[in-house]
Regions:
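Generic recognition of well-ordered alpha-helical segments
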Residues: 87, 139-142, 181
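Short glycine/proline- and charge-enriched loop/turn segments
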Residues: 59-67, 116-125, 160-163
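Short acidic, glycine/proline-rich loop/turn micro-motifs
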Residues: 9, 166-169
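Non-catalytic terminal and boundary segments that flank Rossmann-like NAD(P)-dependent oxidoreductase
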Residues: 54-55, 168, 173-193
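C-terminal helical subdomain
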Residues: 77, 101, 124-163, 170-176
């Protein structure tokens, strides 16, 4: 995923964070589905920030400018990816293909540096909780390979354990609408599945 500032648009007119963090995984998954057989597993990378995300009517285009507004846009994309994970799990429930979400936690990458005056302070506060890239990848690997996760579907995991997702997210009113809106958007761009 990415967390950029200032707002950038793709050549298709989508906000870049939305395009990379949500639309690209959606498209890749949808394009690979016809090749998948029972036993295949799909793992999407989300973030605990999905809990503060919102899906608004201008989700695909808007974005916001400035250092402090990229976090809400990022959170919105992670909510969208979790909703996609849940919706696809429902659609694939009888096909033997599982799809789950992995929350790697705060991982020591360039993405966590905001180039802001408060970075040294946040580094001191969060450093004890920051994972190495290998530690961050462990949950996704667990979902992809472990026996424990082979029959799980539509779940969110963190630290290699199933996370309890709030009722509001598990039964999100916009889950099916987001799927439909994404399909419409991609058809408008000439992409069909």
């Amino acid at each position: 995923g990415i967390l950029t500032t200032p707002v950038r648009k793709t050549e298709d007119g989508l906000e870049t964070i939305v395009s990379v963090n949500y639309v690209a995984p959606y498209m890749l998954t949808r394009q690979l589905l016809p090749l998948m057989q029972p036993g295949c597993r799909i793992v999407n990378t989300v973030s605990c920030t999905y809990a503060i995300g919102r899906i608004e009517p201008d989700f695909f285009e808007k974005g916001r400018n400035g250092r402090f507004f990229r976090i809400p846009v990022y959170s919105n994309t992670k909510l969208a990816l979790l909703l996609f994970t849940q919706e696809l799990a429902e659609r694939l429930q009888n096909q033997g293909i599982t799809i789950n979400a992995s929350d790697p936690g705060i991982v020591s990458t360039n993405m966590i540096t905001m180039q802001a005056w408060f970075d040294p302070l946040t580094d001191i506060l969060f450093r004890p909780f920051i994972k190495t890239p290998a530690q961050g990848a462990a949950t996704a690997i667990h979902l992809a390979l472990s026996d424990e996760a082979k029959d799980r579907n539509g779940c969110c995991y963190a630290n290699c354990k199933k996370r309890n997702v709030s009722e509001r997210i598990r039964h999100h009113a916009q889950q099916k609408q987001l799927w439909d809106d994404t399909e419409i958007l991609l058809r408008q761009k000439g992409i069909r599945f």
